[in-house]
Amino acid sequence: MARYTGPITRKSRRLRVDLVGGDQAFERRPYPPGQHGRARIKESEYLLQLQEKQKARFTYGVMEKQFRLYYKEANNRPGKTGENLLRILESRLDNVVYRAGLARTRRQARQLVTHGHLLVNNKKVDIPSYRVSQYDIIDVKEKSLSTLPFQVARETQGDRPIPGWLQVVGGRLRVLVHQLPERAQIDVPLQEQLIVEYYSK
C-alpha cells in the first residue's frame, strides 16, 4: 500500500480528528466531507475500531503493514498492548522531531529526517521510522541550522509545549530523550483499546 499523500484536511474530516495540528480548515468543518457529511450514521463496533486504527495510522504517517508489525511487537511486550503501541509510535524519530518543535507537522518532520538533516548520537540517521531510546541525543547538522525550517524552529521555540520526556537545548536545537513516554504524556486523541480490539478479532 502506498503512503497517503492526498489532501490531509479531507482525511482529517473523514476520521473526525485533526491529523495536522492547528488545521483551521478542519476546525471550521469538523464533519465528514461530501454531500451527506453532516448526516448521522449509525456506527458499528467494527467501524469504530477501524476508524480508531486509521486515526493512529494517519496521525503518525505509518503504512498498514508497518502498523501491523508495531501492533505485534506491542502485543509481545509486557504491559498493556495499547500503551505499548503508542509508546512505539511516539518513539519514531520523525515524531520526536515534531514533538520537539523542530517541525510544524509530522509530514515536515519526516522530510527533514529523510533529507539527512538530523544526527542521533553524532551519527546521521535518515530513516523516519528509526526508534529513539532513553538518553539518546538528537542534533541538527551544523550546516542545516541555517536552513529555513530550523530558523523558524528557533524563532518559534516556546510556542508549542514540549512533552516532559524530551528536552530541547537552546539555539542549537539539541533534543535530549530523558525517557520514553508514559501514557499520560501522550496527548493524541486516540482510544488505543479500540485498536487492540480491532486486531484481536
UniProtKB/Swiss-Prot annotation:
Entry GO MF terms: rRNA binding; structural constituent of ribosome
Described function: One of the primary rRNA binding proteins, it binds directly to 16S rRNA where it nucleates assembly of the body of the 30S subunit. With S5 and S12 plays an important role in translational accuracy.
Protein name: Small ribosomal subunit protein uS4
Name of one Pfam family that matches: S4
Gene responsible for this protein: rpsD
NCBIfam families associated with the record: PRK05327.1, rpsD_bact
Record organism: Rhodococcus opacus (strain B4)
Record-stated family: Belongs to the universal ribosomal protein uS4 family.
CDD domains according to UniProt: S4 (cd00165)
UniProt keyword annotations, A-Z: Ribonucleoprotein, Ribosomal protein, RNA-binding, rRNA-binding
Chain coiled-coil ranges: none
